[in-house]
Each structure stands twice: as C-alpha cells, then as structure tokens.
Swiss-Prot record:
It is found in: Cytoplasm; Nucleus. It comes from Schizosaccharomyces pombe (strain 972 / ATCC 24843) (Fission yeast). One of its GO terms (molecular function) is GTPase activator activity. InterPro entries: Rap/Ran-GAP_sf, Rap/Ran_GAP_dom, Tuberin-type_domain, Tuberin/Ral-act_asu, Tuberin_N. Together with tsc1, required for uptake of various amino acids from the environment and for proper conjugation. Involved in induction of gene expression of permeases and genes required for meiosis upon nitrogen starvation. May act as a GTPase-activating protein (GAP) for the small GTPase rhb1. Residues 1109-1303 form the Rap-GAP domain. GO terms for cellular component: cytoplasm; cytosol; nucleus; TSC1-TSC2 complex. It holds the Pfam family DUF3384. The gene is tsc2. It comes from the Eukaryota. Keywords: Cytoplasm, GTPase activation, Nucleus, Phosphoprotein. The modification Phosphoserine is found at residue 1036. This is Tuberous sclerosis 2 protein homolog. Gene3D superfamilies: Rap/Ran-GAP. One of its GO terms (biological process) is negative regulation of TOR signaling.
Length: 1339
C-alpha cells in the first residue's frame, strides 16, 4: 500500500492493522494523521484493532494534546479514540492502562471543558473506578490535583457570579462527576491506594468542604465519607477533620441532614468508632471556633441517648456522661446554648430517659436551665437586645417546663426549692401561658393550698390576689379555680369556713359577669360540694341568695346555665340518696323555672331537657340518657349550638360512698310516685307532677314565644308521651293535649311563636303528627269520638301537608289495625287522596305498603265498591307504567346506587303484589269486569317494549282465577296404573299433559301454568256401555283390553274446526325425550306460591350475649301469645306440603314443630329459636340455631330484656332487617303485670328507609302479630332485592314462566318451516306466549 492509497480514505472502507503498523508514524503530516485517526475512530464501531496498532497510533499522536496545539477538536478526538477502543476491549492490559493514563495525567490543559473530557476518559479507562491496576499509585494525586483546581475556581466566586448560568452549571456538573468517580474508587479499589495518597485525597476533600459553598458540595462530600466508612477506613490523621465536617452538616436544616445522620451512624458502628467518639468529646470540650460543629456534637450525643443505639463502642457512654459532655460547651455561643437547652427538653419529654435521671443529672439540668434563663426577656433592659433568639428561648422554656418532672425533683427541693420557686415567679410575667401554668402546677403538685400545708391560707390568699389583679388569661384563671376546687374536695369541718371566707365569697362578689365555662363551673362545683357535705347555715343562705341573683337578667348566660346545672345536679344527688323532701323542692323549683316565661332562656331550656328525660315503668320513675338532641335540627334547621348542656360535676367531687357520678341517666327509684298533683309529698315518697307537666306542654304549644324551646319540646315530646306507665293516671290532660294538637293540624288554632323564614308550616306538622301518633298507646281509654278524631287528623295531614304525608300514611296504616271501626268509613276518601299523591316518588313505597296491608284485612274491605277497587288498581298500574327505567349500572358496588335501584325494583314488586292480592280479594262474580281495565293498564305500561315477565304472570293469574276460586296449588298426577300413554303439548305459556290409562280407561289432564298446576281426571264411558246393559254377564267373558283412545284424541275435541294458524299451533313435545322429562320434573319442583322465611328470636330479661339469647327455650306468656297470632303451628315431619324454609324434616334437628303463615299468593315460615332444641353441652354457641337465623334476611326480635337491643347482637352477613318488639314498660318481670302495648322499631343494616317501623311505633298486643307479620313480608321482599344487588325482583311465578319459555324456545323451531317469515307482531306473540287479549269477551 503506497502513501497515496493510505491518504485516499474515500477509496478504502477502513484502515487495517497492517496499514497502521507499516505506514503510520509521527512523520506523517499533522492533517493526514488526523484524518487517519478519525477513520480508525469510526472503524472501531465495526472492527477490533490490535493493542499494538492502537498503542502505535497513540504514541504517534501525543502532539495532538501538547500545548503547541490549541485545537480542542483534535484533543477531543484523541480521548474519544481511547474511550472507544477501551470500550471494545474485554480486558485491558496494565501497559495499555498505564500508557493511556500517562496522557490523561500529563495533559497540560486545565480549563473546565478539558478537565471534564479527561475525567470522562479516566472513568472509561478505569471502568468507573472498578479497575486501577497499573495506576494505583498515581490516581489519588491526580484526583487531589483536580479537587484543588476546583477549589481554585471556587475562590474566584466573585468572577463566576458575573458569568452566565450555563458556565456555573458546567462547573457544578464537573464537580459532581469528580465526586462520583472518587466515591466509586473508594468503594471498589481503595485498598490498592497507598495511605499517603489516600490521606492526600481526603485532605483535598476536607479543604473543598471547608472553603467551597456548602450547598454545592455537602451531599457529595457526605457520600464520599459514607463510602470510605462503609467500604474502607478513614485515615487516622484526617479523622478529626472528618468528624468535624459530619457534626457541622448534622445540624443543617437542608435535606442532607438525614444523610449526615446516616453517615454518622455508620461511623460510630465502624472499627474506628472509639477514635470517632474521642474526637466528638474533644469538639465538645475544647473546640470554641466552629459553632456548627459543637452544635452537631451536642445533637449527636442527644441522638445516641434518644435512639438508644446499641453498639459496643458506645456501651461506655452512659446517660450521665452524655449530660456531662453536653454541659461542657455551655456559654460558648448563643446557638450552642440553645441546642443544649433543646437537648434538655427532649430528654425531659422522653419517659425512658426521665426515669433514669439521678441526682447529679438533675443538678446539671437545673444548672443549664438557670444559665439559659439569661436569654429570656425577664426585664426591660438593654442587655436583652443582644440576644437574637429571645422568642425561641421562651418557646423552648415553655416546652421544657411542660415536661419538667417536679415529683422527680422532690429529693432536690431542700437545695433548690427557693431558687426554683423564685425563678418561676420571676419569669411568670413574661413567659407564655403554658409556662405560667407550671407555677400553678407547682402549687398543685406540692399541695400548697391544701389544709395539710402549714402555709395553705397564705398561699390561698396569694392565688386570690392573682385572680383579682387579672394578670392571668382566661385559661390560667380556670386552672387557678381548679386548684381551689381540688382543695375544696379535701376540706373538713374546720377548713371549709376558711375556704369560703378567704376565697370563695370574695370571688363570688365580682363573679356574675364571667362568661366562660372553665372559670364559672369550678365555683358552682364548690358550691355543690359544700352544700351536700357540710351543714353550714351561712353557706346555705348564700347559695339561695346566689340562685335568686343568678337567675335574674343581670347575670351572664354562662352563669345562668351553670346555676341551673347545679340545681339539676343537686336533684341527682338527693335522688341517689333517696331524700324525699329536697327532691320535691328541687322538682318544684325547676318546674317553676320551666313554666315562667320571664326566666332566662338557658335556664328554661335546661329544665325542659331535664323533664323530657323522665320515664316510668309499672312501679317507679327513672331518667333516661338516650335523648337525641339533634333530632329537631334534621327537620326544622335549628342551630344545635342554641341547645345548652348541663355542665358535668368534677370527678374529684364524686364521693363513692354516698354519691354516684352525676350523668343524665338514672335507674328506677320507687321513692318517686306518679301523681296528678304537683304539691303532694310525704316523708317517705315523692310525687311526680305528671298532670302539671302535660299542662305545661299543652300551654307551651299555645303561648310559648321562644321558637327554640317550642320546637325542642314538640320534637322530643313523642318519646315521653308514648310512655304509658308515666301518664296513664293523667288521662284528662292526655285528652286535652290530644284535642289541642288535633286543632293545630286542623288549623283551628295556631302556635304563637314566630316561625323562622326558612321553616315551612308543613315541617312543623311532622312532629305534631308524630306526637298524635304516639297517643295510640292510650287508645283503649279513648271514646269512639276520640278514635274518630284520631283518624280524621291523620287524614287531614294526608290532605293538607305534603311534607308530612309519610307520617300520615303510617298512622293511617296503624289505624287499620288498631281502629278498624273508625277508619272503615274513611277508606274510600283516603284511597282517592292516595291516588292523587302517586306523583310524589318519595311516597311510593309507603302508599303501596299501605295497600298491601289493607288487602290482608278482609273486614275493612268487605264493603268496598267497584270505584274503590278501581282506585286501588289505578294506583298500582300507574306505578307500573311509570316505573324507574333509569337504573344505575348493576355492576356498580356503590351502596347509594344499590339502594336507589333496590327501591325502584321494590316499588315494581309491590305494585304487582297489589294487583295480585286485590284481584284475588274480589268476589268471584266481580272479577270479570276488572280484567279488561287491568289489561289496558298493563298494555300502556308495556307500550313500545316487550312484555315483562311480571306482566305476563299477572295475565296468566287473571286467566286462571277469573272464573275459579280454588286455592293456588301445585297438583301432580294421581295415576296408580303403571301402563299409561302420555303426551305433552306446549300452548302459549302453559304445558298441557294428557295421561291415558291403557287398562282402566281413565284419562288425566294436567295443565301446568306459571300461576299453578291443575289436574282433572276423566273416564270414557262409551266403551263400557254394552256391558252395562247386559243382565247376565258371566266371568268367562272378559272386558276388552287395550288402549281405548290416544291423548291426541282428547285434545282434538278442543281444537278450532276452522283451523289454527301456524304460529298458534300447540307444540307437541317428544314423549321419549329425557330432556323434556327432566324439564317438566324441574318445573314441578318449583313452588307455586311465593315462599319466604324470617327469624324469630326471644330475648330474656337482662340478656345481651348471643349465646344466652339463642339458648332460650322457655319464653314468656306474652311471647307465646304473639307467636300464636303470628302464624299456624305445623308438624315438620308430617306436613310435607308446608314450606319449611330449610328446617330439618327427618330427625327433629330443628325441633318437631314450626310456625308458618299463608295466604293465596304468599307463605312464610318462622325460624323460632325457642322451638329448636338447645344442647349447651355439645353446642354452647347454639350454632345449629344460628345457621337458620344467620341466613334469614329479616329477624323478629321479641325483646323483654329491659335493655336497648343492638343490631349486631347476633351478627350475620345476610341479616338486613331486625324488627325489634319491646314492651312499653321496662320491668315486665319485676312488675308481673300484663303488657298490652309494645314499641316496635326496624333496625337496618344500612340506611334503608322502607318500613313502617323505621321510626318506632306503639302497637297494642291485639294488633301486634298481624302488623309485624305484614311488615316482615315486605322487609323480606326488599331484602331479597337488595341481596341481588338491586336486580329485578324475580317472583316465583316469573321463575316458572321462564322455565316454560326455555322449553318452548327449544322446540319452537321444529314447528315453523325454514322459509316461513314472521312479522314483528307475530314474533312478539310467539315470544310472549300470548296475544294478551281480553279473554273475558269470549268466556
């Protein structure tokens, strides 16, 4: 190869090794060598050159990077060539690495771009610091020189500030890359570097950290030191500087402080940890030049103690030595002192450290606290201006004193008490409230104002002076009163008068304008305590005087409220002590406050709350706690903050020997008797003024001017007046109250209070009607006229007040069961009104449930006219026609969406149920006239849409029972002859089976429909005629045997002689097809009426636990009476036709008997736990009972426990509704009297609002079984819908219809020819199985 071809690069694809070895040397022209090098550089992508060739090239291009050549592009090419070559070599020889390194090391150019290129080349050459063999003695000094060069650039920071941001960024990137390489070198090859060179590099890093800008270098320096600690060892000579840097960065507020903490933790866990701690101690003891380092050392000692680091090297560092070294730099610098004070604070707030402090530790801590107090702004002086952290010191003192354990200081008080107390008193005027409270806590801790202290009177006067000078804020004064209150709780006969004269009475003189609870309440707590514990006539007179003064208009609202609260607490005290005279006096006084409009609102409101909580059982009065204060605000938008609460008495005043804790709730007290008079009382009993209280309620509705009091009374009255035992003796006032509330509804009278603008009058009628509804508990005492008035008032509420319609509907439903005579004549008008309310979607469930319940009361509907029935059918049809088709997605798991969809499906199910029940309740002769009318309504509902299954089964039901009044049943074949010819046809939505006996001539017709199966038996007498008229028929003459007729011959008699259209032909099913036999068998096993189940649980006296409740087998007579009214007893083994709901029929596992109920379309079995066997020994948890109750969607709870029943008492995944029945009187077992009225309430798993008993109702024992059963039926249907995630309700008839449709669709194609085209109308008829025509026109 000649020189020309060597230079003619365009004619050669690459330069080969032989070419380089033969022709390339330093004598070639510079530009030609540059071209060849570029060609080699590019050729390295595809060709691997030998190391000899590359070394020869490298040695002959050294002038490219000499100072004589200032072309940066040439130098860049040289380094790129080297980097590309190295990247192609799997293993680089030591000679090659040394040769390349010499060039990098001796490169004379020092600008930032050249250094970056050299650093990059060095990184490639050493595989990013992983391989330094051959250059291990020289790489350290090179890196040190580069660090020094960077430090030189940092010293010229002023010049760099004038440069653009890009230049600064380039310098910073080089620095980071240099540190990254150095860190890798330390990680992987530091053991090869000699210690002097190692020390040289570390010192350069230290110089960088000490002179460069901290935020630029600290993270990289920390990573470098971390790598050195973890993978190698820090040279001993540089360890002090390293620890100094780590301590300085540890106190930084930047993000790298956590990194510094991690590095320090690694250092103290390394082999040089002992030396590291020596350097930390030296910094604390001797370093007085680097503030940050000293602060960091203090913080490090704190960290070791707080984190309790487990390490052999620091095992000798105890808490005492840590506090000792922390105290060393005290006074060096303000910031250091602040760090030391912060360390003391953190030690004091850590219980594990606080408990380990000894005498000497406390001595040093107090020295620190007292020395650092000079930084606090104690006095107005010029010296305090020198301190920049005054506020911070004050704040940290607040925290220190919060955690200062004075109990631990008790052994030191002899030496430090005077200094400490005077110190706290001095700082009191300028320190924050928390610190000032420490002074009060000191009084509290050492009982300085307790009578047991010899200076307690002097200290008490000192506290009085603090209160009177008003230097304390509100919270401090409240704490001050709390201290005196505690001292009052341990007072005796001698100290009580002194306490009153020296503190209590002087405070009271200037007390009436106080407005904060925490200041006022302790005074009343002391008044209460002294009143009930000491017979001090002067104090008693003072209390009476104060009550008269505080109830007046000159006192603040807080004073009035707490004065009334004290009066109530006094009543509770005497109630618990059963002291009749003061009980009667306080009752009379509070009733006077309540009845007097001129008394303050807050006092009257508290008394109203007090009286509304009273309840009675058969023999005594008790006070309940569960009164919902927020109930008025849900309907009437009253601000809850307007309702005052009784301030609770301090726990320190509860004398367990004589007084229970004063909360609202109180158990029975037979000391208080029920009376109609408010003035009668005796030595051993108290009469409760029920008549006076009722009189106030009625008068309040007429004359009360305060809206809040009036509404609170109206909205909470229902719970109290439903307590029959309490007011049964005041019937005259009950009658008056009923008359007045009826007048309000009829708008004969009006309330006098000014109604707020945001409250509608209809909203007020809701609680009024609820109150009238609760008077059902007295209806057995009402006259016929009063019962009629009750029905009329609810009907008026239905007509006049839209917002109260749901209350009126529920009340009218109760009237159907409780007052049938009074409501019977009103029912037609009620139905007309309900038909006008169907446009209100929120009333749909209530209206339809009302109609369903009404249909099950035959005595009420016996005189219904055609117009009444049409109203009912019209309501149901309207709901079907306007059902909600805009359901949420069925895949949605949102509870709110599921509830919304469930309501929609429930309304549709109720509407069809109304059609079915009411149609079957018609007299047989009247049914025909309503069929066309109902069909028109159903067609309107399905216009433009396919007929629903529920619509089709309604049609089928009317077809089957329009002319028949037989029971809906599932009859089966009764043939006993095994030789039978059978054929089955599908016609429309029915199966028509003909069974012909071959031998006897009997013929059986079985018609299977969605709404029932009917069986008829026939006999062909024609074949027997000739034998019947023979006089002498001998035995030798046998009857003709064989098939007399086929099933088809019987069916032919019912065919149209004019022919049947193709789509209307009966479909003959294959008689020998197993799938047909299986389908018919499955169909026959589907029940013909809706079968539901519900749990029935008896809860005995004081029972709470599930196991105890389920184990009951001996219920009360009232429960048995209720059970007998609920259903009919049947035997599980013998009554196979009755739906058992999963109960065992073979082995009496679930008992021998059960209760069920059935009407024409529905049956329900009750899983009664008391009728199931109980075996505590083998089944202590009664799981055999729980397997039924736990799977019932609805459970009836007959609760005679005397306790509130919780929904989760018997937890179950599938139990959605609990209908809880509770006797109106609490103590049934103790009174032994007949319980006639019950509270019934539906508890739901979710916020489901569908039931009559969503809010509890009062029901008599006579009506209880029927109304509970009807609500249980509805709840079971709704629960089925909800359990299906709001899917459509599948009625049992609809399920039978679907089975028929599947069978018809399977064989339909065999009847129609392949080329037969059906129009849409015909397809619809085939799909529906009927033309939905009016069959009464030809029957």
């Amino acid at each position: 190869m000649n020189n020309k071809s060597l230079l003619d690069l365009s004619s050669e694809p690459a330069i080969k090794d032989t070419d380089i070895l033969s022709y390339f040397d330093a004598n070639l022209p510079f530009k030609k060598r540059h071209q060849i090098v570029r060609s080699i550089y590019h050729g390295l992508k595809y060709y691997i050159y030998s190391s000899t060739s590359i070394i020869q090239v490298w040695q002959n291009i050294q002038d490219f990077i000499s100072t004589k050549n200032d072309n940066a592009a040439f130098r860049e090419l040289v380094y790129n060539l080297m980097m590309r070559y190295v990247s192609t070599q799997k293993h680089l020889s030591i000679i090659e690495r040394h040769t390349f390194f010499q060039t990098i090391e001796k490169d004379p150019f020092q600008d930032i771009a050249e250094l970056q290129l050299r650093l990059k080349s060095l990184s490639v050459l050493t595989d990013e610091g992983h391989k330094i063999s051959g250059i291990e003695n020289r790489v350290g000094p090179l890196l040190s020189a580069w660090f020094n060069q960077y430090l030189q650039w940092q010293s010229q920071a002023t010049e760099l500030q004038g440069k653009d941001a890009d230049s600064k960024l380039v310098h910073l990137l080089f620095f980071k890359s240099l540190f990254k390489f150095s860190t890798n070198l330390v990680k992987f090859q530091w053991f090869l570097v000699p210690e002097p060179q190692m020390l040289q590099l570390v010192n350069s890093v230290v110089q960088i950290c000490n002179h460069a800008r901290l935020e630029d270098v600290v993270t990289e320096v920390l990573m470098f030191f971390d790598s050195m600690i973890r993978y190698s060892v820090i040279p001993k000579a540089s360890l002090y500087d390293t620890v100094l840097i780590l301590c300085s960065t540890y106190i930084s507020t930047y993000s790298y402080s956590k990194l510094a903490q991690s590095v320090i933790f690694n250092l103290i866990s390394s082999p040089v940890s002992n030396l590291a701690f020596e350097n930390v101690f030296n910094i604390l003891q001797y370093n007085r030049s680097n503030v940050n380092a000293v602060r960091g050392a203090v913080r490090l000692m704190r960290f070791l103690m707080l984190q309790e680091v487990k390490n052999d090297a620091i095992a000798s560092i105890t808490l005492s030595s840590s506090i000792e070294f922390t105290e060393f730099p005290l006074g060096f610098n303000e910031n250091v002192d602040f760090e030391i004070l912060g360390t003391v604070y953190l030690f004091l707030r850590t219980p594990s450290i606080l408990n380990r402090l000894n005498f000497l530790d406390w001595h040093r801590i107090l020295n620190i606290l007292m020395y650092c107090s000079q930084y606090l702004p104690l006095k107005a002086s010029t010296s305090k201006e020198a301190f920049s952290k005054t506020a911070a010191f004050a704040n940290i003192y607040d925290r220190v004193l919060d955690f200062l354990d004075f109990e631990a200081l008790i052994p030191l008080l002899q030496q430090f008490q005077v200094k400490l107390v005077f110190f706290l008193k001095d700082v009191l005027p300028v320190l924050k409230p928390k610190i000032r409270k420490k002074l009060l806590r000191l009084f509290e801790t050492y009982n300085l104002i307790f009578p047991c202290n010899q200076y307690w009177v002097f200290n008490l006067e000192f506290l009085l002076g603090i209160y009177q000078c008003k230097t304390f804020d509100l919270e401090d004064r409240a704490l001050l009163f709390k201290l005196v209150e505690d001292a009052c709780s341990v007072a005796d006969e001698n100290s009580a008068p002194i306490l009153c004269s020296k503190f209590l009475f002087p405070v009271i003189e200037s007390f009436s304008k106080e407005s904060d609870d925490c200041v006022v309440s302790p005074v009343y707590n002391m008044l209460f305590f002294l009143s009930v514990n000491f017979q001090n006539p002067g104090l008693k007179d003072c209390i009476d005087h104060i009550f008269q003064q505080l109830i007046s208009d000159t006192s603040s609202v807080t004073v009035r409220r707490l004065a009334t609260s004290t009066l109530i607490r006094l009543f509770y005290y005497y109630y618990d002590l059963r002291d009749a005279v003061p009980i009667q006096e306080t009752l009379a006084k509070m009733l006077e406050i309540l009845e007097t409009p001129s008394f303050p609102f807050v006092s009257r409101m508290l008394c109203l709350q007090f009286f509304l909580r009273f309840r009675a059982n058969g023999t005594s009065i008790y006070i309940c706690e569960n009164i919902d204060l927020n109930e008025p605000f849900k309907v009437l938008n009253v601000d809850s903050e307007l309702i005052p609460a009784v301030y609770p008495i301090s726990d320190s005043f509860v004398n367990s020997a004589t007084v229970e804790k004063h909360i609202w709730e109180r158990k029975e007290n037979d000391l208080i008797k029920i009376s109609n008079h408010s003035t009668e009382y005796g030595k051993d009993f108290v009469t409760f003024p029920t008549s006076s209280l009722l009189r106030f309620y009625r008068k309040s509705m007429a004359t009360e001017s305060n809206w809040t009091i009036l509404m609170f009374m109206i909205t909470h009255l229902a719970d109290q007046i439903s307590n029959r035992s309490m007011f049964i003796g005041a019937l005259e006032e009950i009658y008056n109250l009923l008359d007045f509330m009826c007048d309000i509804v009829f708008e004969r009278v009006s309330i006098s209070a000014e109604i707020p603008s945001n409250i509608r009058k209809a909203n007020i009628m809701i609680p009024i009607l609820q109150n009238v509804q609760m008077l059902f508990v007295y209806h057995d005492q009402f006259s016929r006229a009063q019962e009629d008035e009750l029905v009329s008032v609810f009907f008026a509420g239905l007509q006049k007040w839209n917002e109260a319609c749901h209350v009126s509907i529920h009340s009218l439903m109760l009237c159907c069961y409780e007052l049938p005579v009074s409501i019977r004549k009103q029912l037609p008008a009620i139905l007309v009104t309900l038909s006008r309310l169907i446009t209100k979607p929120d009333l749909s469930v209530h209206i339809l449930e009302f109609l369903c319940s009404l249909a099950r009361l035959p005595d009420l509907i016996a005189n219904f006219t055609d117009a009444d029935y049409r109203q009912i059918f019209a309501i149901a049809l309207k709901y079907i026609q306007h059902r909600d088709f805009t359901k949420e997605s069925k895949d949605s798991n949102d509870t709110e969406s599921i509830l919304k969809n469930s309501y929609s499906s429930y309304v549709l199910a109720l509407a069809y149920s109304v059609l079915q029940i009411w149609f079957l309740s018609l007299r047989l002769t009247e049914r025909k006239k309503f069929v066309p009318w109902i069909l028109r309504g159903l067609k309107l509902a399905s216009e433009g849409k396919p007929l629903e299954d529920l619509c089709l089964v309604q049609y089928d039901m009317m077809q089957q029972f329009c002319y028949s009044n037989s029971d809906i049943n599932n009859q089966t074949s009764t043939f006993v002859d095994s030789d039978v010819e059978s054929e089955t046809w599908i016609r429309g939505n029915s199966l028509f089976t003909i069974n012909v006996s071959v031998n006897s001539g009997f013929l059986e017709a079985v018609i299977r429909r969605p709404t029932g199966t009917t069986q008829y038996t026939f006999r062909n007498e024609a074949s027997l005629q000739k034998f019947l008229w023979e006089e002498n028929l001998t035995s030798s003459k046998a009857l003709t045997r064989g098939l007399l007729c086929t099933p088809s011959s019987f069916v032919s008699h019912f065919l149209d002689p004019h022919g049947i259209s193709l789509y209307n032909q009966p479909l003959l099913l294959p008689s020998n097809d197993d799938s047909v036999r299986r389908a018919i068998s499955v169909f026959d096993r589907i029940p013909v009426i809706e079968s539901l189940k519900a749990g029935l649980v008896y809860v005995g006296y004081q029972q709470r636990r599930e196991a105890d409740i389920l184990a009951n087998t001996n219920p009360s007579e009232d429960f048995l009476t209720f059970l007998n009214g609920l259903g009919t007893l049947f035997e599980l083994k013998t009554d196979q036709k009755v739906f058992a709901g999963g109960l065992d029929r073979e082995n009496d596992i679930d008992g021998a008997f059960a209760y069920c109920w059935k009407d024409k379309v529905t049956q329900m079995v009750f899983h009664c736990t008391t009728m199931m066997p109980t075996n505590i020994e083998h089944d202590p948890g009664c799981t055999l009972k729980k397997r039924h109750i736990g799977n019932d969607f609805v459970t009836i709870i007959f609760n005679e426990s005397g306790l509130e029943y919780d929904f989760d008492t018997i937890p179950s995944q599938f139990n959605f509704v609990n209908i809880v029945i509770t006797p109106e009187s609490e103590s049934i077992r103790r009174t032994g009297r007949q319980i006639k009225f019950y509270k019934v309430k539906a508890l739901t798993k979710y916020d489901i609002d569908f039931s009559l008993f969503r809010r509890y109702k009062i029901v008599s024992s006579d009506a209880l079984p029927a109304i509970v059963r009807d609500v249980t039926l509805n709840a079971a249907v709704f629960s089925h819908i909800y359990h299906r995630s709001a899917g459509d309700y599948v009625h049992i008839w609809a399920e039978r219809l679907r089975q028929l449709k599947r069978l018809r669709e399977k064989f339909q194609a065999s009847v129609l020819p392949e080329d037969y085209n059906l129009d849409e109308q015909t397809k619809t008829k085939l799909q529906n199985g009927t033309n939905f025509s009016d069959f009464t026109s030809y029957l």
